[in-house]
């Protein structure tokens, strides 16, 4: 199982739901750096006891999931929340509604995996991925499908690179 290899693992969607009935075993199996990416429905299946923690406070809920699982958690939504193992948390508020379509989460996961492969640490990779995901979706506008988002990302990255703050 990938979770026992000692290698960084990125899990999302069905890779999480498969553990719905054995969540506690799943948490115990995570022995290496792990990133979990989910929306509320997937989150509720993997962390059923955290649904209404503290009146539904998203930060409390996601911090609880990170502590319980030992994974960096990204909970997708209108305000995407990322929580690190040390409790640091950020909310990304630039998630336009056109991101709520099939395949878009796969693009986010792949973007984050790419950042991780380049040496970015999980918390920063999650937040950078979520932010760029939102910017690219906003740039494209309505009618977005996964392929459109992939095609929009290079121009967003070029735009950032051309800014003085990102120059060498």
Give residue ranges: language-model regions:
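Glycine-rich phosphate/dinucleotide-binding loop and adjoining beta-alpha-beta core of small-molecule
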Residues: 1-94, 162, 166-168
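Short, well-ordered loop/turn and helix-capping segments at boundaries between secondary-structure elements
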Residues: 8, 106, 117-118, 155, ...
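A short structural micro-motif
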Residues: 53, 132-135
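Feature representing long, continuous alpha-helical segments
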Residues: 60, 90, 109-110, 151
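Short glycine/threonine-rich catalytic loop with a Thr-x-Gly-x-Asp
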Residues: 96-112, 122-123, 142
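Phosphate-handling active-site elements
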Residues: 116-129, 137-143
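Charged C-terminal helix
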Residues: 134-168
